[in-house]
Amino acid sequence: MNNFGVGFADEYKMSFIMNNSPLLIKSKEFALQIIKVCNTVKQTRKETVLTNQLIRSGTSIGANIREAFYASSKADFIAKLHIALKECSESEYWLELLIESGYYDDKSVLDKCVEVKKLLISSLNTAKQNNE
């Protein structure tokens, strides 16, 4: 056992799950894409208010999903995924504002956000069904 009460087999299992989870993979890809979008907009358009909000919410999605994998209970797991979903929805809003205001024109990042949101909704529904 390590200092956190998790044995080696549990750590290995969690590492495997985390490295192969489509939700974690997609949310990390999205976070990296958000960082690039925000850097581009800051450099080319000198806009910081929207991008600061977007970078916070867009990178927090994956962080909350990762936290969920180490939740202390099923209810905690569901709560963390729900926070990630709210952050995803917020990111979608900031992206819509950036795109519709003309600060950014590549809608593929918005498509990625919607993809992550759908995965989160599906994961939440499954987790809630398994918790009943």
Which residues are covered by each model-predicted region?
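Short, C-terminally biased terminal segments at protein or domain edges
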Residues: 1-67, 71-132
